Design a protein with these regions (language model features):
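Sec-dependent N-terminal signal peptides
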Residues: 4-14
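Acidic, metal/ion-coordinating pockets
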Residues: 19-212
């Protein structure tokens, strides 16, 4: 049986050194809540808050890192762990489509939906998945069209499996009609099933989760 390294994506920036001496840069976002505009960082200094550069700044950083990585024959993987649009007027007025446009511009590799991504219903979540140039992955989520179990990425010859998992508590804080027909299966049982499904196809497995 093939031995697989399994890692949970729970850090912001990580570099991993593989045996063939290239770096895998993991870029990770979470709880964007539609805030891709410039916003004051009141958590740093409530009286004299520096301005966070927002989506444009994130694009500049990711583009710079990808350019540098390409020159060194390294690889950049960009993922998100959900709650992408609810929380700002920019995000909510069109159900998150503007945020998906930005994420397409950023060239995300995959995202796992969060609880707040159901705020305009499961059909809206399916619509967002159809608008994205990258997969929405949540292997334990049932009843939502367009959601995939996993994604396999070829990173300079190293095959990486991304398995998505979502919290079973999606009903908390949501109107019942927003998750009607939706079910979430057991996290660990589903994870074991997905690992067995892809372990012979990949060298590394990352778990991209929204479990908080």
């Amino acid at each position: 049986m093939k031995k697989i390294t399994i890692l949970f994506l729970n850090v912001i920036f990580v570099n991993l050194l593989f045996s063939n001496s290239f770096k895998l840069h993991l870029l990770f976002t979470n709880n964007i809540h539609g805030a891709i505009h410039e916003v004051p960082a009141r958590f740093i200094n409530p009286e004299f808050s520096p301005i966070l550069a927002g989506g444009a700044g994130a694009f500049t950083y990711a583009s710079k890192l990808r350019k540098e990585a390409k020159l060194k024959e390294d690889f950049v993987m960009l993922t998100d762990a959900g709650n992408i649009f609810q929380g700002s007027q920019l995000g909510t007025y069109d159900g998150g489509s503007n945020i998906i446009k930005w994420m397409n511009w950023m060239a995300y590799d995959a995202i796992v939906p969060g609880v707040r991504d159901f705020d305009q219903g499961a059909n809206n979540l399916s619509k967002l998945a159809s608008e994205a140039n990258f997969p929405f992955i949540a292997s334990n989520l049932e009843g939502v069209d367009g959601i995939e179990d996993y994604k396999i990425i070829n990173a300079n010859g190293v095959k990486i499996g991304l398995i998505g998992l979502i919290t079973p508590f999606i009903s908390e804080g949501l109107l019942p009609e927003y998750y009607e027909g939706v079910a979430v299966s057991d996290i660990m049982k589903t994870l074991g099933t997905q690992i067995e499904k892809i372990r012979d196809e990949v060298d590394l497995i990352f778990v991209l989760s929204h479990l908080g």
